[in-house]
Each structure stands twice: as structure tokens, then as C-alpha cells.
Curated annotation (Swiss-Prot):
PANTHER family: SERINE/THREONINE PROTEIN PHOSPHATASE, SERINE_THREONINE-PROTEIN PHOSPHATASE. GO terms for cellular component: chromosome; cytoplasm; nuclear membrane; nucleus. Expressed in gonads, nervous system, intestine and muscles. Inhibited by okadaic acid. It catalyses: O-phospho-L-seryl-[protein] + H2O = L-seryl-[protein] + phosphate; O-phospho-L-threonyl-[protein] + H2O = L-threonyl-[protein] + phosphate. Belongs to the PPP phosphatase family. PP-1 subfamily. Serine/threonine-protein phosphatase essential for chromosomal dynamics during meiosis and mitosis. During meiosis, promotes chromosomal cohesion and germline immortality via a small RNA-mediated genome silencing pathway. Antagonizes the function of air-2 kinase during meiosis I and mitosis to promote chromatid cohesion and spindle attachment. Dephosphorylates histone H3 at 'Ser-10'. Dephosphorylates histone H3 at 'Thr-3'. Also involved in the activation of chloride channel clh-3 during cell swelling and meiotic maturation. Its main location: cytoplasm. InterPro entries: Calcineurin-like_PHP_ApaH, Metallo-depent_PP-like, PP1_catalytic_subunit, Ser/Thr-sp_prot-phosphatase, STPPase_N. It comes from Caenorhabditis elegans. The active site is at 124 (proton donor). It is an enzyme of class 3 (hydrolase). This is Serine/threonine-protein phosphatase PP1-beta.
Amino acid sequence: MDVEKLNLDNIISRLLEVRGSKPGKNVQLTESEIKGLCQKSREIFLSQPILLELEAPLKICGDVHGQYYDLLRLFEYGGFPPESNYLFLGDYVDRGKQSLETICLLLAYKIKYPENFFLLRGNHECASINRIYGFYDECKRRYNIKLWKTFTDCFNCLPVAAIIDEKIFCCHGGLSPDLQSMEQIRRIMRPTDVPDQGLLCDLLWSDPDKDVTGWGENDRGVSFTFGPEVVAKFLHKHDLDLICRAHQVVEDGYEFFAKRQLVTLFSAPNYCGEFDNAGSMMTVDETLMCSFQILKPADKKKYPYGAGGVGSNRPVTPPRNAPAAQPKKGAKK
């Protein structure tokens, strides 16, 4: 399909048609429509900086992981675009049952509102990861492997960090021992895969750890953990107020670290149908005051989200030091 002929409004309205339906109902766009979404959004990502400079007010969301009906709930709470400006912190695909609907709606909104709707890259927007954790299988089952490769080309062009009003630094994972200047992020060339070490890897993979002084080993086997004083030094050096990141399940959907100098956001409630966590969205107003909207874990009988679906036999990325968000009894880790 010629990208210029992409009927965006029609695509968005079909994706939104399932609002109010029983969760799990699929929306089957045509292959050429999805290809068009990937190609057009890729052009937009490349036309915008890899380190976005954004202005408040806006709403920030953490991991969604293919939980499409929860994404719709987020928009119902926060206002469907263009009613509010949005920044998503990555991890759109894998684990949940409807990665395709999730990523297609997000890409469609990016194309429709390029200056008001922003998507960062998460560690799952990477071929070697989403090959394993569900997205590849969903593409293969519902379309074909070629389409999965088209998504890979798109994901390789996503921006990796954002700064809001020169005060709030946002990325998917966290800080890097290699990060001395913002210019280093700006110099990362796209398209690019995510390497298994170095600055880009750390921005997408690292985690805060209250028990670490400086930098520590990461249980994920990738990147590092960083302690509270690393956060304080980074903020002071770059004249920032807050780091906002995602990447870890937290029980209340948001969790502060290092005297409220860092916040973790997670926007997939009942993650994988195995956790009892809430999801949340952070609203940043014009004065940079931050508040949280909470998506409570849905009633299981009413909303059988992830239970037993795609990903039910896949290991969940373990939350670090978050005993409150452990799986329910009998759930697979």
C-alpha cells in the first residue's frame, strides 16, 4: 500500500471499535495497512531527534506489553489523543495476547499526532527479545514472518530518551556508567539494533537498586544496577529534577526511589495474568507537578486478560526487590 493512501482515521476507528467488547476480541487490519503504519511512523521517528525535548503538560505511561484492553483503559482515563499529550516509555509488545493491536494503535496515533504523541524504545522493541517472548509468534500466527521483520525495521528507528522541560529525564530502563553528556545520546545513529552492552543497552536495560553503592551487577544478566547516589549525582550534574523510567513490575503501578528523585512506572495491570499489580500513568502539569492515575487490577472473572494466553508458559521478567508484587499462589514465575 502506498503510505500516502493510508486511511488513518479508518484504521484508528476500527482499532477503537472493540471498546466495550469483552477483552480479547481481535482487530485484524490488512497486512498492507500494518506495513504502511510501520513505514510512515519510521519516517517520523527518523525526522525527530533520538533524544526528544518535550514540553509539559503530558501523560507518561510505562510498559504495556500487548495488554490492548488495558491500553484502551489508559486512554479512557487520560483522554484519547489529541485530548492529552502522551509519552510512552517502551515495551509495547510481548507477553500479552494482543501485541499487534497495541503497537498498531500507538503507531497510528504517532502518525496522526506527530507533535503530541511520543513513543520511546523499550528493551522488547528489539528483534532478539521479541523473537522469544511472544511478538514473533503472534506475527507468524496472524500474518507472516515478513511482517515481523517490517516491525523490526520500524523499532530500530525509535527514539531512546526524552527530556521534559529540561527537568525530567525519561527512558525505558535507566542510567549508564558510560553516560557523561546528553550529546552521547544524540550521537547514536539510527537505524540501530540494541547492542548487548554500552550506552544504548543500558538506557533500555538498567535498573535502580537501593542496596547498591555505585554500579552493580544486574540479575537480568544484561547491563547494570545503580544506587541512589548515582541518581543524585546524575541529576545534579545535568540540572535535572527527576528520572522517569519503566522496565520493572511495581505493585502500585508507580514506585519512587532515591528520595523521590526517580520514579518507576508500569502500566500493565495484572501483568501477564500472574501478578496482582496495578498499572499507572503519570500526569505532568505545566508547573511540572506530577500526579498518578491508577488502573486497578481488573476483576479476573470479568476480564480474563493474560491468564493462560500467549506468554503463560514464558518466564516473567522478575521484579527486583519488589516482594509485594510477587505472583499469586500457583502462578508460574
